């Protein structure tokens, strides 16, 4: 079964990262494209621009509502999610890369949990 991990894009890559997936809609601030080691950039399973902007207005305060709204967006993007799950099914480890400074309140954590549920 595939193990899904999350990691900031600014952390050093490791051999244990496996298949590295950038899961931010926007390119990480200050990161040159030639320096980021990633296998694929999956914009279609990231929060919509409006949801992302709203969430960043009050990260901790909006967390629970954001999580529910993002999961609803993922359900609305079932084809993209299914395609991604098919893509990662053959990998033992997949690392979702995110740029946020916030290690707890970030969309990658929600996406990780959502994907783990739907991989089964």
Predicted features and spans:
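Residues lining hydrophobic/aromatic ligand-binding pockets adjacent to catalytic sites
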Residues: 1-120
């Amino acid at each position: 079964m595939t193990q899904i991990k999350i990691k900031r894009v600014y952390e050093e890559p490791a051999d244990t990262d496996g298949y590295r997936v950038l899961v931010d809609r926007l390119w990480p601030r200050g990161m040159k494209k030639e320096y980021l080691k990633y296998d694929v950039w999956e914009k279609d399973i990231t929060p919509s621009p409006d949801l992302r902007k709203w969430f960043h207005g009050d990260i901790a305060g909006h967390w629970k509502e954001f999580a529910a709204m993002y999961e609803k967006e993922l359900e609305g993007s079932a084809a993209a999610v299914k395609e991604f799950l098919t893509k990662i099914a053959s990998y033992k480890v997949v690392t979702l890369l995110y740029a946020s400074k916030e290690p707890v309140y970030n969309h990658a954590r929600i996406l990780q949990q959502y994907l783990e549920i739907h991989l089964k």
